[in-house]
């Protein structure tokens, strides 16, 4: 994720229903424990998990994203309420800059240790983060690391988008999004059968009283998986399919995979 883009990510994601998404996740996360949030971005789900009494390790490749997440958590911790200081205390979370295909969790909240592998109760990976992996080989590494980082009978929940997203969003490979705070122009190009490039020009209004905008440019590459391949692959890597689901509120082209470690 581009450093500049991290600075305005929350403006860009302002209209996402985080609470609705979080409530969807909580259908499968029943008991308190430790959660790994892979590709945590600016920490919106971390805030909600901490509020509900979980311990959380947030992992992201963008240092700038993690800096924003840290500021959000600190703001919650310093709001003056004793309960908030406890829920959002530094002993309840850890933010780690790392690629999710390489990450091995060593954060042991219970024993206050950080020197050996510590398996989590749950792993979540939201907003089609797995589609930003380069190819199926990287997805295999991701699944293997998740298996290593997860307790037996623990749950891994991630979502992936299908080819349909490009028909859903782009008309003639262009998508225009105009909001009071910004205007964005998305351009889509298919690089190969499963690889797609998306270039985003984002214009953020500097002041609501004038027409001065600041321009940001972001280039993203998505790899699209065959859902049947995902199901077969994870079953061969120590997981069972607990459920698969879609939620029209988050787009028909998005599939949620809920896996249980054997």
Kindly label every feature range from the protein language model.
Residues 122-137:
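A short SAM/SAH-binding and catalytic strip from SAM-dependent methyltransferases
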Residues 237, 248, 252-262:
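Core SAM-dependent methyltransferase catalytic element
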Residues 44-103:
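Class I SAM-dependent methyltransferase SAM/SAH-binding core
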Residues 140-152:
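A short glycine-rich, Lys/Arg-flanked "PGG" loop and its adjoining helix->strand segment in the class I
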Residues 106-122:
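A short acidic, Gly/Pro-enriched loop at the edge of an enzyme's catalytic core
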Residues 1-30, 32-41, 44:
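Conserved class I S-adenosyl-L-methionine
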Residues 137, 157-228:
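SAM-dependent methyltransferase
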